[in-house]
Amino acid sequence: GADVFLIQSTTPPSDNLMELLLMIDAAKRASAANIVAVIPYFGYARQDKKGKPRVPIGAKLVANLLSASGVNRIMTIDLHADQIQGFFEVPVDHLYASELFVEDIQNLNLDNLIIASPDMGGSKRANVYAKLLNSGVVICYKERATANEIGDMKILGGVNGKDVVIIDDMVDTAGTLTKAADLMIENGATSVRAYCTHGVLSGEAYSCLDKSKITELVITDTIPAIHNSSKVREISVASFLAKTIKAVVANESISSTWRSNNQ
């Protein structure tokens, strides 16, 4: 008859997803009153649509599996696309790392702060940060030839003399991120930092970061890892999730608890 909160990031996705499903089943068979799956990093989130024929929509499949498993509620941080919430048949609490990042950016005391999005798809997220930080926004536009292969990139907006903070939901190979950072320095930016919620950091990511002109990459610990670059700094989501879980247990409004859930 207890409320059970299962905390499991799905990375690597397949093994950890299966483990989560088994834990949900175990809790259900033990007569748990409510089962909440706390998934800091939602694997397969980038498979949210069909970009070409004969490909799966992995995010929808995973949502179906979780919904059918007996879970009563999902809690996750910075989904790759907001519409993934609609894939589930159970309530989804979509939390935002801006609750952690905004304060950290404010503590930098940057004189000429401007927020940047590394692509057009992240412009909404960048605008939320800009509003919270009372800053302007610039957007990078890129032509991607294939996955993780970057074509030409341009900046919409001026960065000359600015301290740029790039905002994104995740960083994988860091190709887009470092190319954007170097382009901004070439266009007169004083400094470039990046805040990305999920640090996948695969392939040559660390090498790209070390070779680039980016000052610092700040990520959260939604994906457990040992980081091989002095440019990477990690912020824990533990207290953030703990406060959210406490609000759920007390039947309090999450949107009232966190400002970013009102954006």
Regions from the PLM with identified roles:
Residues G1-Q263:
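PRPP-associated nucleotide enzymes
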